[in-house]
Amino acid sequence: MIIPALLKIPKLRAKFIHSIKQNYFDEIDISIPLQNNHWAKLFRNDSYDSFSEIFIQNEYEGFIPDIEINRVIDLGAHHGFFSVWLQCKRPRSKIKSLLVEPSKRCFHVLTELTQRKEYLNNFTFFNKCIGNPQDEEILFFDRPHMAASKYKTEDNEVAIKVSVLVPEDILNWQQPPYDLLKCDIEGAEWDLLNYYNLILENTKFAIIEWHKNNKDYSQFIELIRELDFEVTNSSSNCYEEQESDDSKVLLIKNKRF
């Protein structure tokens, strides 16, 4: 009887709610209904950021190629909402999606997502990052609100070590060709183009979010062309500051297919 009485006190109730949201958010079990009997569970108090970008602001609308999509590589999966969104859009397909995400904050989220009955045996999670495959591990700065990356932004930040994804990891998951690769990895897309040629050569389309990171957009486009890809759609990222041209979303097509 003590707890109900305490909850009647507004200041105490606010403190309880704040503590639960910060420390036990996944136990609140907030799920949002989607198309075709799918649900999006908000596992953490920053889950809404990526949910909003993908399901409300439609970040990837217009960037999905008009082909049959069965095998997807989701780099920078965060909470898995891109793969969930794509599966909702294609209810007649059982999409095999490889979700790659190095963040420890997302480990529990993606582990539970891949074990849900609607994605079991179709969604696979690797807790690894994109980088030079010759390095077994690299330093990674884990942050909330989709800001995690391998780049240090604050002097007092402490990095963690994460395993590097190697091309063989992908080849052992599913044999090529791959229909679609989505890449939103906060600047590490340069590493994707430099070190994962074998995977890209066997990928029909890729959606890549480009971030400047001391290299110009023209250099990025030149590298894409050297890999025998062409840009079929491009847009300034409307979720960043519009006056800043530091990021773009691109759909690129492999000329080999």
Feature map (PLM): residue ranges:
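Phosphate/nucleotide-binding beta-alpha loop and adjacent structural elements of enzyme active sites
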Residues: M1-F257
